Amino acid sequence: MAEPSPSTTVPAKRGFIAAPWHTLSILLFFAYMVFSGANHASAAVSAAGPVSQAALIRGYLLSIFFGFGMAYWCWAGVHWKGGTLRDLTGGRWTNWRSIATDVAVAIPFWVLWEITARLMHRLVNRVPAPTAPYQPPSGLLEVALWILVSVAAGIGEEIIFRGYLQKQFHAATRSLGTAVVLQGLVFGLMHAYQGWKQVMVIAPLGILYGALVAWRGNLRASMIAHAWSDLFEGWLKFL
């Protein structure tokens, strides 16, 4: 895999990129989401029936709002400390070659991600814990919204967890490896609404994303891989 180009990657700043109180506000909100999500998963398992289109669309819209809304809040915290969006993303594409490089990195990474996901699913399926049923999108409106959900996850969640939290955890612990693991655990817990089995699957996948970002020094390849993985796992593989 190619090394990141110095001209398109912004060196990570040392120290906190946002005030500790700002990070605490995010973690407290996430704690609320974890507990409410776990209750939602229990209710979904108990219902054990098809989800109405209205409920499905509402869930998609909330996911889109969460992805972009929380990414904006992360940017606001960095901005208040004098930083820019580049401090979160690590830089943007400047030419077609840099785009091709990141796509070339994202493709084999996604293969590794997919293998890891399948192995984790096999392991957790042995654990006797309920899992919320999944209903793939159907029809033009649901599919269009799911594409937006995938884009929001690829951009928003990478900014939130790898662009923001990973840097904050790194500043707090002085250990990049610890930061990668911590943000992955938080990332997994944020999917408690899907059931605890999914948390056990998604946390290692979040750690993989974090390792990719730590290696590349930017979010570009992870954004591509994340958006594609959500698009594939949530819709395309059911076609």
Question: Which positions does each model-derived feature cover?
Answer:
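Juxtamembrane helix-loop-helix connectors linking adjacent transmembrane helices
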Residues: 45-60, 83-153, 171
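Residue-level signature of transmembrane alpha-helical entry/exit and packing/kink sites
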Residues: 19-25, 55-63, 98-102, 142-146, ...
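Acidic (Asp/Glu-rich) catalytic motifs at the cytosolic membrane interface
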Residues: 154-162
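Alpha-helical transmembrane segments of multipass membrane proteins
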Residues: 34-35, 66-70, 105, 109-113, ...
